[in-house]
Amino acid sequence: MTSIRQLHQQLVNKEKTAVEIATEFLARIQALEPQVKSFLHLTPDLALAQAQKVDEKIARGESLHLLAGIPIALKDNLCTKGIPTTCASRILENFVPPYESTVTQKLRDLGAVIVGKTNLDEFAMGSSTENSGYHVTANPWDLSRVPGGSSGGSAAAVAAQECVVALGSDTGGSIRQPASFCGVVGLKPTYGLVSRFGLVAYASSLDQIGPFGRTVEDAAILLQAIAGYDPQDSTSLNLPIPDYSQFLKTSLKGLKIGVIKETFGEGLDQVVAEAVNQALAQLKALGATIKEISCPRFRYGLPTYYIIAPSEASANLARYDGVKYGIREDADSLIDMYTKTRAKGFGAEVKRRIMLGTYTLSAGYYDAYYLKAQKVRTLIKEDFDRAFQSVDVLVSPTSPTTAFKAGEKTADPLSMYLSDLMTIPVNLAGLPGLSLPCGFDGQGLPIGLQLVGNVLREDQLFHVAHAYEQATDWHKRQPSFTN
């Protein structure tokens, strides 16, 4: 297993060049992609050009950022100047952004090597990456199963070691749930910590960009690089960003951890519950105090989310009309063109959510649904506020199950929505959440542990996650087919 720090040392010690590292990863992608299908667009020429610049820097004796020369993948809903950005939708199949998102610009400036854009559920709407308008990504642990979603391509690419780290976006669990299914670390930061400028919007009050890595340290290094104030994002927080690496400690003495009672109810697989309980015992052994916490409004998270998120999506997706960018269908009138373009360009799940949102925002139902959902959102946030008065970090399973078979839930949207039961309330409250591997089921599929922190307490999440990771070896296991 190759970490950012290991590759950095190889570069600094001149054991390998950045071009050699990039070439190795590009070859690995070529070998594995026919089966995993993590990517929508590969950027080998860009990767080698970026690697060459890093080698030139080394030759000049200049200091390197930890991410310089590190192969990284980007979810294909992040705008990249001159590189297609499709959001896995047919409506944007010919779209090449004229500008760069803030996070990808930061990575370019630091010398990271971009190997490609990863697959996702169309416009980030889904929990399995099966809603992509192009192809379905496979889970590297079992190619017949889904990698989770919507950032399934990024999670699968990291798990298959097609890149070292990757970026995803999380609106209701879209980083944490695929991290759980693919056995990697995934973090959704506090809302506003990372700029959303250049992230194609799904639900603007919930979306947040975050890192995937195979270790907690790799995720911490990547978050450090992308976090920070951006005047181009009105929701960006103007606060200093700490060095997250300093919080990677191994003792949890004095730390109070709360177990969310409501996440251990009906629908939770027994094997997942057992793995999480064993993880709690390990956290206790590391010095943490464990207590049960009740968040009674947690169970309203799913219905609240499926009113608020589609409402925001129906507004955000109104811009795809065949006029400004994306595909355009031939038609006799403007209305006809809108209708044909959107009917052909959007997939079934996106259409479903647009209709849901348009319905809940309509005059007769606005108060009954949208306004009520916003009030319930406040109550969910209050539950978390109350919990954090007595504990530092909250713990739950990341997802009620391990990865399911491709095609198993596509006919039943409600059963698919339940995959994000544990993750959604964290987005509604704007809190940071991290998923890391805490075991495997009987079929060798990874199980994820979710840690939830108070606002801007990513430091505590990294502390707890790193301590647990160092005391276990789940993160060292690799999918057998990728070796």
UniProtKB/Swiss-Prot annotation:
The keyword Protein biosynthesis applies. GO terms for cellular component: glutamyl-tRNA(Gln) amidotransferase complex. The keyword Zinc does not apply. Gene3D superfamilies: Amidase signature (AS) domain. One of its GO terms (biological process) is translation. Pfam families: Amidase. The active site is at 75 (charge relay system), 150 (charge relay system), 174 (acyl-ester intermediate). PROSITE patterns: AMIDASES. Keywords: ATP-binding, Ligase, Nucleotide-binding, Protein biosynthesis. InterPro entries: Amidase, Amidase_CS, Amidase_dom, AS_sf, GatA. It catalyses: L-glutamyl-tRNA(Gln) + L-glutamine + ATP + H2O = L-glutaminyl-tRNA(Gln) + L-glutamate + ADP + phosphate + H(+). Its EC number is 6.3.5.7. Heterotrimer of A, B and C subunits. NCBIfam families: gatA (TIGR00132). Belongs to the amidase family. GatA subfamily. PANTHER family: GLUTAMYL-TRNA(GLN) AMIDOTRANSFERASE SUBUNIT A (PTHR11895:SF151), TRANSAMIDASE (PTHR11895). This is Glutamyl-tRNA(Gln) amidotransferase subunit A. The lineage of its organism: Bacteria, Bacillati, Cyanobacteriota, Cyanophyceae, Oscillatoriophycideae.
